[in-house]
Amino acid sequence: MSTPHINSKKDDFSDIVLMPGDPVRAKYIAEKYLSNFVQVNNTRLMLAYTGFYKNRKISIMSHGIGIPSASLYTRELIIEFNVKKIIRIGTCGAVRDDIKLRDIVISMGASTDSKVNRIRFNDHDFAAIADFDMIYNIVSISKKMKIKVSIGNFFTTDSFYNDDKKMLNILKKYNIIGVDMETAGIYGVASELKVQALSICTVSDHITNKEFLSSKERESSFNDMIELALESVL
């Protein structure tokens, strides 16, 4: 069933969807890792593909930037296309000195400055957390694949450009492992609609020391994260 944002048939999607923010990355993942894949959405250039990874049917769809966009697409995928498991595979910023560029970080929970989860939760704070089984599984697989991961709390913000040094110090104080713009919203939708969700990110920017990956470096720095996510859903 089509929605205003996803022009697809009911059975076009797998029950498992991996979601990068960038539609170009969705295309890259499909072309590099999936066999017999087809494009199942291009509305608003939010590209989606369904194919097979080691005989497992999997869909890849971009969710755009920010909680409103990510919440909209995850909600429609769950309600209209019967998606049961979502993995965000994105990028994040780091504030801790021990977290470096290209490190893979897994969000077990996410605080936020967004109002979205409070709107959902009758103006109260909502504990936006990942699915425990998905965390346990992906950590186990990371050890088998010898891929180093770090696990902790994220901070999901509506403001990409924010030079508030006081807030930066608070993030450090509370041991925030990654800063992004989507995770808390995705976890909120998943909890409300009773599906599984996990956010796994590669550090593309270090907020404290101002280091960042170039556009070219980003093209080749995310494969470990992508392969880990794919292996975790087999």
UniProtKB/Swiss-Prot annotation:
Q: Locate the coiled-coil region(s) and give their ranges.
A: none
Q: What catalytic reaction does the record list?
A: a purine D-ribonucleoside + phosphate = a purine nucleobase + alpha-D-ribose 1-phosphate; a purine 2'-deoxy-D-ribonucleoside + phosphate = a purine nucleobase + 2-deoxy-alpha-D-ribose 1-phosphate
Q: Which domain of life is it from?
A: Bacteria
EC code(s) of this entry: 2.4.2.1
Q: Where is the active site?
A: 205
Disulfides per UniProt: none
User: Carries keyword Glycosyltransferase?
Assistant: yes
Family the UniProt entry places it in? Belongs to the PNP/UDP phosphorylase family.
GO aspect biological process, one term: purine nucleoside catabolic process
Q: Which HAMAP family match?
A: Pur_nucleosid_phosp
On subunit structure and binding partners, the annotation says:
Homohexamer; trimer of homodimers.
In chain numbering, the residues marked as site (Important for catalytic activity) are 218
Under PANTHER family, the record lists:
FI09636P-RELATED, URIDINE PHOSPHORYLASE
What Pfam families does the record point to? PNP_UDP_1
The entry's cellular-component GO terms read:
cytosol
Recorded protein name is: Purine nucleoside phosphorylase DeoD-type
- Detail which positions bind a purine D-ribonucleoside: 5, 180-182, 204-205
